Amino acid sequence: VHQETIMSVIIQVDRAQIGKKTIAEWLRRRDADLATRALAAKADVRLLDLTAPLPDTDRIEILTFDDEAGREVYRHSASHVMADAVKRLFPDAKLAIGPAIEEGFYYDFDLSHNFVPEDLERIEAEMRRIIAEDLSFQREEIERDVAVEFFKQRGEDYKVELLGDIADDRVSLYRDGEFVDLCRGPHLPSAGRIGAFKLLSVAGAYWRGDEHRPMLQRIYGTSFPTQEQLDEFLRLREQAALRDHRRLGKELDL
């Protein structure tokens, strides 16, 4: 299921406002309609949260769900909400990685319990609660060594390993409520911006793709601003799966 890439909106910056307002505050005054659709921003090559101060730049690119970078931010935030829900329901789960991918997102977990379809329904219900709470995504930049100690205390071994590969002295974390993750960002202003979502499947995945490392459980999902968009995606996905099934049947002469 392919989604067309549309150019995002570029706006000239009033230099008198630089550093005095957040990007979201500035945008609400410039274009109230666009502000309701904005997910994040880009200045030069930097991706920024809407809660960041208006940067020192001449032009700023506003990312919405209509462009690829905006969809990535949207779905990355959805992956954090899913991971938050999993940690609430399964506190022993260890967090690995959870990126946005072309048509959705996934998150890898290390957990002795094997996820079953009923678990996905429970996780979805918890995600709906988190979205209803409208928890804000808060960026925090700290010393790398402090982050290592923080995640060690939480028993998050995979995050500690990832931090060992980061050369920078400072790293960024994102919080929503009690949930904290190591992440470059950016993210949506809050979880309440996520409109519709669906957890699609569970698969096994070796940590870092190495068969000698632990086998993790990967939950795949997708998210859209509206239920109509999600329903259309699921309909097209089902049609594609049916075509593949029929083609395979012909190839195997079934």
Give residue spans per PLM region:
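Short, Lys/Arg-enriched N-terminal segments with co-localized hydrophobic residues
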Residues: V1-I6
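Short, contiguous acidic and Ser/Thr-rich linear segments
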Residues: I10-T22
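Short strand-turn-strand beta-turns centered on an Asx-Gly dipeptide
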Residues: Q12-R15, K42-V45, D110
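Short amphipathic, charge-patterned alpha-helical segments
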Residues: G19-D33
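Short amphipathic alpha-helical face segments that pack within enzyme cores
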Residues: T22-W26, S77-A85
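Short, basic/aromatic beta-hairpin or loop at an interaction surface
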Residues: D31-A41, H80
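Auxiliary tRNA-acceptor-end handling modules of aminoacyl-tRNA synthetases
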Residues: R37, A52-V73, M82-A85, K94-G98, ...
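Short acidic beta-strand-loop surface patches of small beta-rich interaction domains
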Residues: A38-A52
